[in-house]
Swiss-Prot record:
Substrate of transglutaminase. Residues 267-278 have a biased composition (Polar residues). It comes from the Eukaryota. Residues 1-20 form the signal peptide. Belongs to the gliadin/glutenin family. Residues 28-58, 105-125 have a biased composition (Low complexity). GO terms for molecular function: nutrient reservoir activity. Residues 28-125, 258-278 are annotated as: Disordered. Gene3D superfamilies: Plant lipid-transfer and hydrophobic proteins. Gliadin is the major seed storage protein in wheat. This is Alpha/beta-gliadin A-V. The alpha/beta-gliadins can be divided into 5 homology classes. Sequence divergence between the classes is due to single base substitutions and to duplications or deletions within or near direct repeats. There are more than a 100 copies of the gene for alpha/beta-gliadin per haploid genome. InterPro entries: Bifun_inhib/LTP/seed_sf (IPR036312), Bifunc_inhib/LTP/seed_store (IPR016140), Glia_glutenin (IPR001954).
Amino acid sequence: MKTFLILALLAIVATTATTAVRVPVPQLQPQNPSQQQPQEQVPLVQQQQFPGQQQQFPPQQPYPQPQPFPSQQPYLQLQPFPQPQPFPPQLPYPQPQSFPPQQPYPQQQPQYLQPQQPISQQQAQQQQQQQQQQQQQQQILQQILQQQLIPCRDVVLQQHNIAHASSQVLQQSTYQLLQQLCCQQLLQIPEQSQCQAIHNVAHAIIMHQQQQQQQEQKQQLQQQQQQQQQLQQQQQQQQQQPSSQVSFQQPQQQYPSSQVSFQPSQLNPQAQGSVQPQQLPQFAEIRNLALQTLPAMCNVYIPPHCSTTIAPFGISGTN
């Protein structure tokens, strides 16, 4: 029994040793199977004692069969991906240009245009109203400028003798104050509007002339009315007196004849606040006087075209 056990242990040890030796051998077979065949035959001759165990190892030769990986070459067939080039058949998408059948929509537009015709008339009325408002605003601005430029007007009147536009002789202190006020107003006006400011000064002087002429005419009318009243009173008194005093009536009858030349219509109230076309030469003269006086006094630049413009700001019948 002991010998049998010893033999069994030896057999077990031999099997383990052979397995430890023979396991790496099949791993080397796929690399160089032609060279390893003679090496395998040598241990088989030495270990013929265990024929039953040697028959198990030959089936390990199928391990090199994993070489069918080259059969993965069909993956190269994935190259047909460039076949998505058939996208060009998407050209039919521009076919939605069939929108031209929507032409009936513009046919409805003339229906809307017809009621819009009265709106154009309303727009014309609105434009006229806007123009009137702008003219009114310009007149208001002109009046404001004239009021602001009254010191400049008085300075020009003091330095130059203008017919029917005489002013009171001012003291030197008041005259210097007027100069300072005039220059302050001119410097506040932007350069683009300074030419209009000079025109407004000339316009204010002409308005001053008209006012003085109207006042003179009113005074003359009042004097004439007083003379008429005096004549009427004298006539009444003479009628009550004896006929011997009738000879004094002849020289006194000359007064009413002179009253015919002065009528209230001569005041021309419609001409107030505007320069008449017949006054343009006078306006040009006064403007030149203002241009000679104000820019040098206030050190203000006035463009050259200001002395050549024909239509001044504020003339009646012009913009």
